[in-house]
Each structure stands twice: as C-alpha cells, then as structure tokens.
Amino acid sequence: MKPLRVRAAVCVLALGLLTACGGSGQDVVDSSNVPRLRAHAADAVNGRPRTVLPQGPRSVFTTYRTTGDDGTKVLHTKWHGRASGYTGDVWAWVPPQYAQPQYARSGFPVLIALPGAWGYPANYWADAPFALEERLAEWSKQGKTLPFILVMPVLNPRKAYYDGSDIPGQPKMGSWLTKDVPDFVRANFRTYGSRDGWAYMGSSSGGFAALKAVLKEPQRFKAAIVNGPDTAPDSPLWKGHPAEELANDPRHLARQLVARGGPQVYLAFELGSKEDAVPDVKRFISGYTNGARGPIHSTLFEIPDGVHSGHTYIKRMADSLHWISEQMQGPVAAPSV
C-alpha cells in the first residue's frame, strides 16, 4: 500500500493544495441528491443526552482562516497530550449552530478529520480548497448532515508514517489521536459523554488511522468515514515488533469485534474507481463487515473516474456525512418557553 501514500505525498502541497492532482480553487460538489436526515428515534427513547461542558484548560487560539459569511473561523492552537507526551498542532471549527441561543447548553457531535500523506506539518482539511467547513455549514443548515465540530490534528510528528499507532520506541501517535485529541476537544467545547457523539474521517494514511481507531476502541467512537485507505499497517517502524503490529491491524481488530458481537460501529468507505486500492478495500468490506447486519456496518461510495485524492473524496462527502449522521447524536435545542 505504500505507493498510495507516495502518490498522495506528491499530490499534497504544504497547505493541502492538490494542484498536482488536478484543479485549483474549490471543488464543485453536488449534494442535491442527499436527503434530509430522519428524526432520531433514539432521542425519544433515551431522552436528553448527557452534555459534557468544557473541562479546561482552555486553549489559546489564533484565527487560521475565516469561513464564509457566517462568522465562523478555523482556529489553530498547539496541544500537549498527556497520554502521548507529544505536543502538536490542532485546527478546529465549530458550526454556526454552536453559537445559537437554543443550543447554548447542548453538546455537539465531533468529527476528527485526518489528512492523507504525512499529515504533517499541516492538515489540509482546514484549508480553503476543500472548503469542508463551508460545505458542512451548508449541509447541516439544510438538514442533510449533523452540525459537527471539526477537529483537525496533525497525523504524524514528522514526515514519516506512524500508522496512527503507539509503535514501541516512537512517539505515541495512537494515544495522540484517540486520547489526547479528544481531551483537547473536551477541554474547549461542549460535547457528548457517549460514543454517539464521536466519529473520525480520514483519507489514505489518515483513512487507515480513522478505520483503526473505531475498530480498536468502539466503546469510545461510533463511526468513521474512510477514504481510499490502507487496510493493513505498513510503516517500516514496525520492524521487530510483530505483536504490536498485529494489535494495530484493522483486519485483526475487525475479526475480534465480530467475535465479541459488538459494540456496533458504522464505516462509510469512499473510493475513486481508478484507485489501485479498490480491490483491497472491497476485499476488506466483504471479508470483515456485514453490511446492514453488524456489528460492523458498512457502506461504499465509489466515485466514477475518481483517483487517490481528496478532490475525489469531497465529491461524496455529503453522502458519507449523511450516512454516519443517521447513526449519531445531534445537538438538542432547548424547549420553547
């Protein structure tokens, strides 16, 4: 799978401008066929979900870029992870609904968005060419997706591949992504206490990390959008550590989850039809997921003529976000007086 990562690295420039993969400026995305979300039956059964108010310490943010005309901004800060010991860059964006009075005491669902290639020193999902924040504001306003808090950390500590894992003798990037980054979110934003409010999205190497995070810790994370992923660990840093490598292999984790019978997780895969990864990812889906039956639920959005690029995946992002939104907890408005 390493050639996929190399190709992605060639395509991704410093700020996520994928000019080498074709196109400039914002991609044209048609979400007209994405329906509105259904009412969440779980809300009526379980009542008001438990909101977790910001725990602190609050981060000091700077504005990375302003998004659209709704007053929202992508913010940037650094966060020191207690679990990993790593200090890294994080970008964050809250949807317009977060500041609306009716949601002032409500939690919001969180989407941890991971880039492809090295995912260092930047995270391209924070940048204007993809306009993920502007699109999510539009889609959630239309009722097609939930209004997620977007959190966009660096994926790796340098220009090397750590497979989103705690590789012995290396920076603990698995702990960074699954413990420290959620701690950052809980320190600064209103969230939910249950896994119904937590999901990942990632592409290529970030897709591997997103897939693995949900399969490894399904009690904490419910869903992932997995774009053109690697489906097996392949960092050269695993050499000499076969047991730890196996413990971070999505195939092994999927088998374990199926054997346990749950908890149920939801994986939305995106693939460009021209990707080299198509056969491998389809084998993973057919071999380790059970479609609608679970405990590993899956769906696949295959993009005609699509290649291994964020410009491909953004085209079906509304569909993927809609699909996982149907399984997750949205904000709850205060009762009308």
Predicted regions located by residue number:
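Non-catalytic cap/lid and distal C-terminal segments of serine-dependent acyl enzymes
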Residues: K2-V12, G16-V337
